[in-house]
Design a protein with these regions (language model features):
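A short beta-to-alpha transition loop/helix N-cap that caps and shapes the active-site region
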Residues: 46, 111-112, 145
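A charged, well-structured terminal subsegment
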Residues: 126-170
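Short, glycine-/small-residue-rich phosphate/pyrophosphate-handling segment
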Residues: 102-140
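N-terminal beta1-alpha1-beta2 submodule of the flavodoxin-like/Rossmannoid cofactor-binding fold
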Residues: 1-92, 152, 156-169
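Short, conserved loop/helix-junction motifs that constitute active-site signature segments
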Residues: 94-98, 128
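A short small-residue
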Residues: 1-6, 101, 138-146
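C-terminal basic regulatory modules in eukaryotic proteins
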Residues: 69, 101-102
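Residue-level signal for beta-strand positions within conserved beta-sheet cores that form or flank
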Residues: 31-33, 98, 133
């Protein structure tokens, strides 16, 4: 059994980035993958910001470091991922993600910040030794249907990422 850890960097529940994570996790074979979802908005701000490392934060860091596949997900604020995600990854030791694959997921209101995933989140996780999937996911408002379901382009991006995961771990 392989471990996949999704890290939600949005300060709000039911965000678009969380919806994408749920679609990915629901598509992974549960007989092959044990999934953990870490919602950073639920971890104490003192632990995250003051690095006091309470038990909940320690457990989240350890689960992430031990994961085979990591899915950090964040909305785009000021052309980059959230501070929640930043302070979480800042607490990891150098090279702590060596050998782990990462599928970055980022959402925004428009395609204008689509390169922010490549200029922000990707270098951050690579600095910790992670191997980044080629099929990262950046989705914006127009890629969702009016009923809130994922549109065809978003489904296609998710499917491309799932196929890459299957090739890596198949």
């Amino acid at each position: 059994m392989r471990n996949v850890v999704a890290i939600l960097g949005s300060p709000f529940s039911q965000s678009s980035s969380e919806k994408i994570v749920r679609l990915i996790l629901d598509s992974l074979n549960s007989n092959e993958w044990a999934a953990t979802v870490i919602d950073l908005s639920k971890i104490s701000a003192d632990d995250l910001l003051l690095r006091s490392k309470g038990p909940e934060l320690d457990q989240a860091l350890n689960k992430t470091i031990e994961a085979d596949l990591i899915i950090p997900a964040s909305p785009t604020y000021r052309a980059t991922y959230t501070g929640l995600l930043k302070v979480f990854f800042d607490q990891m030791p150098p090279e702590s993600l060596s050998g782990s694959y990462v599928l970055p997921v980022q959402t925004g209101g428009s395609p204008h910040h689509s390169l922010s995933i490549e200029h922000g989140m990707v270098p951050m996780v690579r600095s910790l030794g992670a191997l980044v999937l080629a099929n990262t996911i950046y989705a914006w408002s127009e890629q969702w249907n009016k009923d809130g379901s994922a549109g065809a382009d978003l489904i296609s991006m998710i499917q491309d990422s799932l196929e890459e995961i299957s090739r890596l771990y198949g």
